[in-house]
Every structure is written in C-alpha cells, then in structure tokens.
C-alpha cells in the first residue's frame, strides 16, 4: 500500500482523521443502486472504477449491494487507536465493509470484527455503549471541514492536501513540499 511505502521512505507519523462521507445514511443502510441512481451514476461503472483503484493498491474489493453509516465504526476506530495492535482494527473494518459487505453501522458486527483481531470485546462494547469517542470523531469531522476535505481518502501534510486515490509520486511531491525528511 502507498502509505506503508511512504512510511518506509520518510520519517513521518500518520494518523486517521475521520470524515462524514454520508452521515445521513440510516443505520440499516441504503441500497447502492438507489444511492447511485440519485446521483446519476451507473452502479456497474462505479464498481469497476473502485475495483481498479483497489487492485492498483493491492487491496481486495468485493461487490457490495448496500452502503452503511460508518459513524460507530469511526468511533470504534478512535478507540482502537488507544489499544495495542489497534491498527489491525482499521484493516479489519475495511475488509468487513469493502470485501465482506457487512453492516459496519451495526454494533454487533463491529464487536465481531473486534473479536477477529483479538482486541478486548468488552472494552469495545463499553466504548460504543457509552459513546466514549463521540467527541473525538466530532473533532475529526470539524478538522476535515476546516481542511476542506470533500472525499476520501484525503492526504494532508503541512496544511496542504490531495483528495482521492493518488499515485505514489503525487504523495511524494506532497511530502517533499511539506519538508518531510527522507530516511537513509
């Protein structure tokens, strides 16, 4: 993945900043066909586009029929950032949503994903039930608005950013312009 390659080439720290891509999506989700139709987009063309992008990154990508509200998954991601090996949850949530087409707005699904990566399920349940990371996600959403984020992924370095799946060379230019130090 490009980010891993950048971490090896540069002395940088990366962090997840969550963005409200479609916060109006209900907990039970929405059918992709209707979602795309409202925007005048062809579902098959969109699937093929995303598949190509994910293939270029070496990431698996399944055929989803629904889109789901990611708010609770984002809160759980913030919780995972406080846990040893928490990064594994981000990868597992990607797989659950984009490969296995699971409803990441459903707390039971989220806790199942937590269990698959060996994080403490009861701690995760408490974090979700008590909405412990709601404010952190709210702050991320505000930060993303302040940066002018309009899509995902967005890469930001020294207050400059690029939106969308970008070639590695574009990300290198972003880091060089930000004065990031190369390794070795």
Features from the language model and the residues they span:
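C-terminal cap of thioredoxin/glutaredoxin-like
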Residues: 1-12, 16, 78, 82-184
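Structural alpha/beta surface segment adjacent to cysteine/selenocysteine redox centers
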Residues: 1-100
